[in-house]
Amino acid sequence: MGVLMSKRQTVEQVQKVSLAVSAFKDGLRDRPSIRRGGELPGSRRGTVEGSVQEVQEEKEAEASAPVVQEESSINRAAWERLRDGRGVEPEEFDRTSRFTPPAFIRPTRKLDDDKPPDICLEPREPVVNDEMCDVCEVWTAESLFPCRVCTRVFHDGCLRRMGYLQGDSAVEVTEMAHTETGWSCYYCDNLNLLLTEEEMYSLTETFQRCKVIPDCSLTLEDFVRYRHQAAKRGESSRALTDEQEEQAARQFAALDPEQRGHVEWSDFLSHESLLLLLQLRPQNSLLRLLTVKERERARATFLARGRGSTISEAECHHARHSWFCKRLTEAPSCSVSISHVGPIADSSPAASSSKSQEKALLPTEQESRYVDWPTFLRENVIYILAARPNSGAIHLKPPG
């Protein structure tokens, strides 16, 4: 059976061949050459000094011959892999010659972005994953890792060559990709990629005004100070009330589930991106960001917890929390904390205890009020998006 190659893969293969050719030429250029004295101006050939120089050059050439042969064999093996379509082995080439991570293109909002999308409760939407790896665009009989959010699938080797799998993360993806918890690809894991160029510019301006250093973790003091500065109006030195400051502290704790005393930059950036989406986007625009898998999980939750075409407000409140339910830490398969993308089973002990605790916190009248499917979706959309990252952090803590 032949190898199916797309135009994009053909371009990548040509780039790899160019890298291999450059490496081969560098090896030839670095090879010491034997110069004959009689061929150069001012030659000392025939003298004692010239004879000694020729002997030394011959010895250097003999010593470098095994190295040149080894480099030649490596390059020849690389050519064979490229010819057979097997790609470049990362352990034999520098990182610069591996697969190049994609250049992310930020989305643009359409003119009808704020119009209500057509997301009906029935009929259900079919969920079908892609057949080809999103990186190499080749179908193979090997196991493909599906994303839990979108329909993309990936080879572990392609993810490794792009630098997205390092160390124990390969084992993590292998264990989690085919479970109920699942694994988010590098597109869906980064919530900041949901922002447009204009929205990202606004967020960057806020970071600069509040003197936030990118790629640095934040302590609780840093986080609360930033929230004060971001919400500051006029000349007031204190922008948050005591209640808002306590809410910021609770959000910090949600972003730091392992209680390390600091929040990673990626989690902080995802949190701020969600807040900006809430501030600038209408609900209909947020609904258009949901993927078919996320819409289907929302339908399954609504039908399982609701009564026909409605669901109680208490269950709707519970659903907002259940998107972030984690697997029990004592379970053998839970060595890595990853956000759940849907409610856990009602029959599980964790679900029962969580449900009873939340019901105790809710007023009794909430259980008697019901909301329809569109309302349920609007109230849950931002939390469904917030549950995308693989991180165990809760990037937007629901109230209550």
Curated annotation (Swiss-Prot):
GO terms for biological process: detection of mechanical stimulus involved in sensory perception of pain; gamma-aminobutyric acid signaling pathway; regulation of G protein-coupled receptor signaling pathway; regulation of synaptic transmission, GABAergic. The modification Phosphoserine is found at residues 43, 51. PROSITE patterns: ZF_PHD_1. The keyword Metal-binding applies. The keyword Lipoprotein applies. This is PHD finger protein 24. One of its GO terms (molecular function) is zinc ion binding. A zinc finger (PHD-type) spans 129-190. A lipid is attached at residue 2 (N-myristoyl glycine). Residues 29-65 are annotated as: Disordered. InterPro entries: EF-hand-dom_pair (IPR011992), KIAA1045_Zf_RING (IPR031946), Znf_FYVE_PHD (IPR011011), Znf_RING/FYVE/PHD (IPR013083). Signal peptide: none annotated. Keywords: Lipoprotein, Metal-binding, Methylation, Myristate, Phosphoprotein, Zinc, Zinc-finger. SUPFAM superfamilies: EF-hand, FYVE/PHD zinc finger. The modification Omega-N-methylarginine is found at residues 36, 307. Residues 29-38 have a biased composition (Basic and acidic residues). It holds the Pfam family zf-RING_15. The gene is Phf24.
